[in-house]
UniProtKB/Swiss-Prot annotation:
This is Outer capsid protein VP4. The keyword ATP-binding applies. It is found in: Virion. Keywords: ATP-binding, Capsid protein, GTP-binding, Methyltransferase, mRNA capping, mRNA processing, Multifunctional enzyme, Nucleotide-binding, Nucleotidyltransferase, Outer capsid protein, S-adenosyl-L-methionine, Transferase, Virion. InterPro entries: Reov_VP3_bridge (IPR048605), Reov_VP3_GTase (IPR048608), Reov_VP3_MTase1 (IPR048607), Reov_VP3_MTase2 (IPR048606). It is an enzyme of class 2 (transferase). The keyword Lyase does not apply. One of its GO terms (molecular function) is mRNA guanylyltransferase activity. It catalyses: a 5'-end diphospho-ribonucleoside in mRNA + GTP + H(+) = a 5'-end (5'-triphosphoguanosine)-ribonucleoside in mRNA + diphosphate; a 5'-end (5'-triphosphoguanosine)-ribonucleoside in mRNA + S-adenosyl-L-methionine = a 5'-end (N(7)-methyl 5'-triphosphoguanosine)-ribonucleoside in mRNA + S-adenosyl-L-homocysteine.
Length: 1058
């Protein structure tokens, strides 16, 4: 059985902007961003450029004037190489700003602008009847009801349809458009039936099973090949949609069936329509060659035409001969009926037939292989050789390897609701600092912030990361089995977020089984829903940290501000349905029923108050700093005055902004407030937005301010990037010795006999490689290897022409793996926050060391696996002191590395520090070599002894990391993160034993007394971008909440002796 999250989401309507947004879209102040506004690729083999626009511009009709813009001449300027990013972005930005669309602004926020008609009218230079009408009455492009988006034009012009050419998705391809979409004036099914019958007499026409805007449209093709390509693409989209839902993925879909229906076509299209309706087993078994989609589908249709299974053969032939009928399963029908129930006025393709797929169960492909083989690649080979030619990997088809953007991740329900807080510690806010902080805040606001953070956030949204978990919860419930959970628990709330139906409890710990035959709806969510639910959990925990029930108390209320159509309101109502007299209210300046439309500050004649307020109102970006500042102050004071406990979003949490909020609260008239900054695990992981928690307290205490806050630091260091972030690449050429590779993967296939040499050559860039064959009779082997910056740093210490070819020769032919089923690989892999923090520290130290002169060596204490080699300049000797360190003698000789397999002596009298040296003590002083925890005083003694010994040396630098005591307070009041937590007053990180933390004040006082030069340094946003970009990794979904606190309270001491 397969289930949908939502079939009522018209994605095309959602892309239509508000009339007042047109100028912002066509006159963007910021330059276009890769992945957000456009996608660009260059194929060196074909010498072809592909530029695809995203957002509203993906549906754009270009005029002859547009084609004359320098943007469209760039492929001619760079016929055989990639267009420089700066030149591409500058020209794209220039072209966007040259676009002028006729429109009429409106303060009615329920209106949308018909982008399709607007850009079509412009592309004709307003010479068509539609264009002339738009010139005369531009307001006709505004609509409230989607079905009225075109009706007003039809009525005004007295026409039956509008033909609009569909532009190639690659805007650099200026060839003729493959087809026109014809928008019909057919408001009722009577007209729809008449038009569909009429189109059967036309040539090369198709249509959908349902229509965007609820307006009938048909596709009219210029050639049979264009129709075949369009049909094939939509079949693949439909099959993939069904496959996702078969697996329980909760994704939004704008129609139940994506396949097209041929109204007048050819025998080729009839064959495609028939095979598309069958949902054949060959697709789920991944045996189709998707690189030749149309050909593969037609070949598959021939197989079913003469299939050995008589039922399948008859069903295929029936579908072929009756291709104008939309064949669907009983589940399809059920979903369509649900659409009709939700919207009785919906228009649907009327000629349908229900068939069963129960007999399509034969599995014709079995996986009998041994699986893929992962090879650990040697650092240095044993065979000397001269130069080796580049190795070129051949392309792999999509049915063998699929490359997706981000690795899926697993997360527990309770982790979704984790949060971290940071409390103020300073009792004054000096006037001179106020002036300085305001200057910093204004400068950062005006220059905007990191494009890389925006790209990482947009690579995959938080709801995409959390949907697999919610999908599993939904499937468990939909099976109808009895489920045990406590009413009011996090599991209960998660079930409410997954299922759009009432949950019935038997007693307090058991959910009643579903009635036989009842299929519950899956809950529709947006990207903010789980964040709002986690904020609800946070505000309940802040009310009573020890509580395990998250139900509201009787006779209490909560307001969710900024709710336009926020599903969290209904989810919380169902979650709290067992509690008497609970009010859960959604409010926003664009809210629709059942939420309440209201602006902040609240009207003076409205007595709006609640026990809790969660405010998710965004600050508009296209306003001055002062306007944004005033708007934020107004929202904060409104929420603080309206509720006992508030959580308020701060889009620009500069130190000046947060301290100004606290100062404003101090002037509200005799009320004393406790404040704290909060981040949740269900926010976008790279977001710097934060929430301020506000609650009045009875005691007349002074207001505390922030100084060097962990959470604020994310925003303050998110400065604008000089360059766009690098998306991990797919490399197909393995050079013998090159330091020009960007982060990413080597991926491709090669003949079996060449595989050993390919593996040997990959050792220069990768620490592991995976191989497998898909056909024992084939001579090809597939290879995947992820670039490892640490391996590159090791390889390029000295150039050594050594090969491990003969070592890998033993793998041929049967040691290379065998796997038939499709393999998925990912450009970005998820990593825990502790791993990313370590990489951030390395990036920070590497930058510091790069500025150091006249040093001869870097000495790593405890660097047993050479993990910190990436910070060592190629010209310096690398020494590792660790009793567990092991590395081949050959590698030491070739790479200028020295291994001392012993424990480092921290006694000041015997410490053997050398001049002209850099020492690394990363994650070392808090544990002994055997893993036991080191007491706090012993840790301080170790730091003291290193500093004291350095005073007797010259030109010596040390980097020492430690855990600062402030993290205990922060994590003790927080619920995230499992891999970093407090146990009995000590800090437990990952699988290590809990250790003592050190007060920073005690450490710095001791260093001042010794008289050594020191600096406390901390990794921040630039290092986060560096680590994730260099290694092709992403924070796990809960890492964004705790990363800032862990970075801040895991600093590095830099000791310097000149």
């Amino acid at each position: 059985m397969w289930h949908y999250t939502s079939i009522n989401n018209d994605t095309r309507v959602a892309l239509d902007p508000k009339p007042n947004q047109i100028r912002t879209i066509t006159k963007p102040n910021t330059v276009p961003q890769l992945g957000t506004d456009y996608l660009y690729t260059f194929n060196p083999q074909r010498r072809s450029h592909t530029l695809r626009l995203l957002g509203p511009f993906q549906y754009f009709n270009f005029s002859e004037t547009d084609r004359g813009h320098p943007l469209f001449r760039l492929p001619l300027k760079y016929p055989s190489k990639t267009i420089p990013t700066d030149e591409l972005v500058d020209n794209l930005h220039s072209w966007m700003r040259s676009v002028h669309l006729l429109h009429t602004r409106s303060d009615d926020n329920s209106l949308r602008y018909n982008w399709m008609l607007g850009v079509y009218a412009r592309s004709t230079n307003y010479t068509t009847p539609v264009g002339q009408l738009v010139v005369k009455t531009p307001a006709i492009l505004n609509y409230a009801n989607p079905q009225d988006a075109f009706n007003s034009v039809f009525i005004a012009l007295g026409i039956d349809y509008i033909d609009i050419p569909i532009t190639n998705s690659n805007i650099f391809d200026d060839g003729s458009t493959p087809y026109n979409v014809r928008i019909w004036h057919a408001p009722t099914m009577t007209e729809v039936n008449h038009i569909l019958t009429l189109m059967r007499k036309s040539t090369l026409v198709s249509t959908h099973s349902s229509w965007h805007w609820n307006v009938l449209h048909t596709f009219h093709y210029r050639s049979e090949s264009d129709m075949i390509d369009h049909f094939s693409a939509k079949i693949l989209e439909d099959w993939r949609q069904k496959e996702k839902f078969d697996k329980g993925a909760l994704v939004e879909a704008d129609r139940v069936i994506q396949r097209l229906i041929p109204l007048s076509s050819s025998t080729y299209v009839q064959r495609l329509a028939a095979i598309g309706a069958l949902y054949p087993n060959e697709f789920t078994e991944n045996v189709l060659d998707l690189s030749r989609l149309s050909t593969a589908l037609l070949q598959l249709s021939d197989t079913y035409y003469q299939h050995a299974n008589d039922q399948l053969k008859r069903l295929y032939r029936r579908m072929y001969n009756d291709s104008r009928t939309l064949y669907m399963t009983a589940r399809h029908q059920e979903l369509l009926l649900a659409q009709v129930a939700a919207n009785p006025n919906i228009l649907l393709y009327p000629y349908t037939h229900i068939f069963t797929t129960a007999h399509i169960t034969a599995s014709y492909i079995s996986n009998t292989g041994q699986g893929r083989i992962k090879h650990s690649l040697a650092v240095t080979g044993t065979t000397e050789h001269s130069t080796v030619p580049d190795i070129i990997l051949g392309p792999t088809s999509e049915d063998v390897i699929t490359i997706s953007m981000v690795e899926p991740m697993s997360i527990a329900a309770e982790d979704m609701y984790g949060y971290v807080i940071d409390t103020p510690t300073r009792d004054i806010w000096p006037a001179d600092e106020q002036v300085e902080q305001k200057g910093d805040a204004v400068a950062l606001y005006d220059t905007k912030t990191s494009r890389a953070l925006g790209m990482f956030n947009n690579t995959v949204r938080i709801d995409d990361l959390l949907s697999p978990l919610l999908g599993r919860v939904y499937r468990t419930y939909a099976k109808g089995d009895t489920m045990a959970m406590t009413q009011g628990s996090l599991d209960h709330q998660t079930l409410c977020a997954a299922v759009d139906s009432d949950i019935t409890f038997v007693g307090n710990r058991m959910i009643a089984p579903l009635a036989e035959g009842y299929v519950p709806r899956a809950m529709h969510r947006n990207n903010s829903t789980m964040k709002m639910l986690s904020l609800y959990v946070a505000i309940k925990k802040l009310e009573n940290f020890a509580a395990n029930s998250y139900l509201m108390s009787p006779d209490t209320s909560i307001i969710l501000l900024g709710a336009e159509r926020e599903p969290a309101v209904n989810i919380l109502r169902r979650f709290n349905s067992s509690v008497s007299n609970v009010r859960i209210i959604g409010m926003g300046d664009r809210a629709v029923e059942p939420n309440i439309r209201v602006r902040v500050p609240f009207p003076i004649d409205k007595n709006i108050s609640a026990d809790f307020v969660i405010c998710d109102i965004n600050s508009y970006e296209d306003q001055s700093f002062e306007s944004m500042f005033g708007e934020t102050m107004s929202v904060v004071t409104t929420c603080a005055s309206a509720a006992t406990r508030s959580l308020v979003k701060i889009n620009h949490p500069s130190e000046y902004m947060i301290n100004s909020v606290i100062e404003r609260l101090s002037k509200l008239g005799g009320v004393f407030y406790h404040t704290a900054l909060l981040k949740t695990a269900s926010q976008n992981t790279y977001s710097y937005e934060t929430y301020i928690y506000i609650t009045p307290i009875a005691a007349a205490v002074g207001f505390l301010f922030y100084n060097n806050s962990a959470i604020i630091n994310r925003y303050m260091t998110a400065v604008a990037d000089d360059e766009a972030p690098v998306i991990p690449s797919i490399h197909t050429i393995i050079k013998e010795h090159s330091n020009t590779y960007s982060p990413g993967l080597f991926c491709g296939c090669i003949d079996v006999q060449s595989a050993p040499l390919a593996l040997s050559q990959l050792k220069s860039y990768c620490s592991e490689a995976t191989t497998w064959r898909v056909d024992s009779d084939d001579n090809l082997v597939n290879i995947i290897a992820r670039i490892d910056p640490a391996r590159i740093a090791l390889e390029f210490r000295t150039r050594s022409n050594t090969s491990a070819h003969h070592e890998y020769q033993r793998c041929v032919p049967n040691g290379l793996g065998f796997k038939i089923r499709k393999t998925r690989e990912f450009r970005y892999m998820h990593r825990e926050v502790t791993f990313i923090h370590k990489l951030m520290m390395y990036a920070l130290i590497r930058e510091q060391i790069s500025l150091t002169e006249s040093m001869t060596q870097v000495v790593s204490i405890g660097g047993r696996n050479l993990a910190d080699i990436s910070v060592v300049p190629l010209t310096m000797k690398y020494i590792v002191i660790d009793p567990a360190a092991r590395i081949e003698t050959l590698t030491q000789e070739k790479k200028n590395i020295e291994i001392q397999a012993r424990a480092f002596q921290f006694d000041a009298s015997t410490m053997d520090l050398e001049n002209n040296s850099i020492y690394l003590f990363i994650a070392v002083i808090m544990n002994e070599p055997n893993g036991a925890a080191t007491p706090a005083q012993t840790q301080i003694d170790k730091i003291r002894n290193v500093a004291t010994a350095m005073l007797t040396r010259t030109n010596c630098v040390a980097y020492i990391s430690f855990y600062e005591s402030g993290i205990i307070t922060r994590l003790s009041q927080s619920t995230a993160h499992k891999t970093i937590r407090v146990e009995d007053g000590r800090l437990k990180v990952a699988n290590y034993v809990p250790v003592d933390t050190l007060p920073e004040a005690d450490v710095t006082l001791m260093l001042r007394d010794i008289g050594i030069t020191y600096e406390i340094i901390r990794p921040s946003t630039p290092e986060l971008v560096n680590a994730c970009s260099s290694y092709g990794i992403r924070l796990g979904s809960t890492g964004g909440a705790v990363l800032d606190v862990f970075n801040h309270y895991s600093p590095v001491i830099k000791l310097v002796r000149s």
